[in-house]
Amino acid sequence: LDEALNAGAWAVEFDYSGFNAAGGGPGSVITPYPINPMTNEIANEPVMVPGLYNWDNIDVESVRQQGQQWKFKSKEEASKMVKKAACFLGADLAGIAPYDERWTYSTWGRKIPKPCKMPNGRTKLMPWDLPKMLSGGGVEVFGHAKFEPDWEKYAGFKPKSVIVFVLEEDYEAIRTSPSVISSATVGKSYSNMAEVAYKIAVFLRKLGYYAAPCGNDTGISVPMAVQAGLGEAGRNGLLITQKFGPRHRIAKVYTDLELAPDKPRKFGVREFCRLCKKCADACPAQAISHEKDPKVLQPEDCEVAENPYTEKWHLDSNRCGSFWAYNGSPCSNCVAVCSWNKVETWNHDVARIATRIPLLQDAARKFDEWFGYNGPVNPDERLESGYVQNMV
């Protein structure tokens, strides 16, 4: 039952977002099976077409040539309207960041799909050898195609602004981490990321502006979200928002529409994270730094999605990813136990306020543990306690 729910939650991400590598872009590709319109028969061989994260801006020129490009009175008005539209189209929070070359990946990539014969007789294009994996032979990845970043070549424009938005994850589901149920809410958010990003891109294109919707690909999301005023970067490497803490997913849409950017905001996250270390204690892979203070990363410290000379707590993404593989589903322990991860109830409002008061910051973690919020912090105790099973 849990696995079926999980599959449904991830369905849009897997079936319609496309082959997006971690380095990401340009755009996305999906592999549906065409239907013969005369016989209504579904073909056994798939075709490759753009997915929801597509960068197809062919309609923009038509809008402009017809003199129908929407002209805003000011960058401020444009920003206000675009954020309002983003939330109407499904975003829970939205902000505007200026395009910053530092956050664009130095190499873009796409998983290389190859045909795999399935038991039902159909051919499925997969980035790994699925029959081999299903027969217990391990995961054999076919590799990645690499692209030099070139906005004008692949999207037809040079970005000026980035619309960054956040989608909330279910509180009750996340607190069961590292269960299949917590994976389901992660998958649901990933699926919604693609849908909402696509809608925002279509909205911009109909106004006569170029757009490139993206998930985790193309550029680093957290620093863009910080620039867009959506929150602060936490010890766990995630964006901490005032409303949801780290319990969300981030997506973004690049555009040539010049928008008034939002300003970064501070509300005590760094000061709190210096003392708390709860996420580091709860990480089963020990991928999160226990150092009291963030540090300026040197080139030798950086992983694929990190920039040198930026100040942050280091996160070992290889350790994190290895536990995901071992666990068989995503782990969200660092999200579940975070003291900023709260819902709108009076006692959680008090706890949220406590995280912003220096004298109470150290106590905020203890309050969580005393009242049993979100289960044991120790990862071994968490799995052995029955908490995950009981929550399901």
Question: What does each model-found stretch correspond to?
Answer:
Residues 1-101, 105-112, 116-122, 158, ...:
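Iron-sulfur (Fe-S) cluster-binding modules
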Residues 83-84, 89-340, 352-358:
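Catalytic cores of enzyme domains
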